């Protein structure tokens, strides 16, 4: 069989990409879906709309590749992480909308748990901080607030899943209820040392174990899709949360290698090898993948608003019509005009972990223009990534980043990538294939069935497209960073 189908279910769109053995894209399709904002800081998706979008793009990608389902060797799945769905085990219907990773409604639950001193337990067992970002408190909220949900969960009538679980449930017509360790490591429920759902954590959050999916490796044959989906049965053999799939797709397979994904949010991962290292409260430790019974761990810095700040300028302020116009506007001025934009629309992630921070544009004068604001918005993405990598340097003994591999839509923005290199004072390397999230899922799926022989083969497929080298004077860089930190401190703890 010729190809691998990779399903990349993201925060704002679903994508299907068909790869060949040389990692060339043979077919592509993408479909946006609705973002639901019931209240300030609440973010939801319609799970059925996500599923219907996948059916559309699978068909479209096959048509674009001019291929038939019989030529698909296997399917790999990657997904927005932490986003939480609970559905009826018998009807397959969700009992509530998907609560998205950006959603902050459970901040008070996290505060109460911290007051009880539970944050240390969660950190030691899961490598995560107590934050609304993760699935555990979202599950608790649904069970506590949706009519009869807790009662039905305790009777075994409900299933929980992150998006990967929901996709596979639907692809197999409810026959398979699984997740992989990488997605599970973002729930606040998985012990990343023992690789088991943790009974103590389930008890703290009052979540019945019966709703949880079975744990699987990131690269193994899980089963086949139902023949009604594509007209034939096809193996599913790869799963990884989006940032971990991107890490694999970037061939960051050796300890110390780092990548940054510039998507809706911005996510930096550093491969830390095969033993978990728990950081004191600021940098997350997660499972990147489990393959052939070997676990690879990463440090991660999570920035909630990355490329989404450009979407906000486009849709909410209507400063431009296309996201690609942002680079043109920003490049038309020599600097940010003294403006600093802290896009804390849903709080701040790594290293601040402040759910009560809010967005701030500071330094405005009568001479400020939309060009300056747009440039400040782009620069905010690089500044936030700088803060994450600085914290990582402080956390990993002997770690000094020499090269940052980048991907995601915003990595195509040359102005942003050059500014990132300048602020970090290291090379920023963009690969020829920037669809690394989908590619990572394809690699994991392909390795499970022998489509690719080993990781050495896939590493040989990685090629650099452009290297951005630091050019900025040190004094200018230091001034920018100093003012950025002044601005971010103004944004913190805004909501009381």
UniProtKB/Swiss-Prot annotation:
Glycerol binds at residues 81-82, 133, 242-243. Sn-glycerol 3-phosphate binds at residues 11, 81-82, 133, 242. It catalyses: glycerol + ATP = sn-glycerol 3-phosphate + ADP + H(+). Coiled coil: none annotated. ATP binds at residues 11-13, 264, 307, 311. The keyword Glycoprotein does not apply. Its EC number is 2.7.1.30. The keyword Kinase applies. Keywords: ATP-binding, Glycerol metabolism, Kinase, Nucleotide-binding, Transferase. Signal peptide: none annotated. ADP binds at residues 11, 15, 264, 307, 413. InterPro entries: ATPase_NBD, Carb_kinase_FGGY, Carb_kinase_FGGY_CS, FGGY_C, FGGY_N, Glycerol_kin. GO terms for biological process: glycerol catabolic process; glycerol metabolic process; glycerol-3-phosphate metabolic process. One of its GO terms (molecular function) is glycerol kinase activity. Disulfide bonds: none annotated. It holds the Pfam family FGGY_C. Inhibited by fructose 1,6-bisphosphate (FBP). Pathway: Polyol metabolism; glycerol degradation via glycerol kinase pathway; sn-glycerol 3-phosphate from glycerol: step 1/1. Key enzyme in the regulation of glycerol uptake and metabolism. Catalyzes the phosphorylation of glycerol to yield sn-glycerol 3-phosphate. This is Glycerol kinase. It comes from Borrelia duttonii (strain Ly).
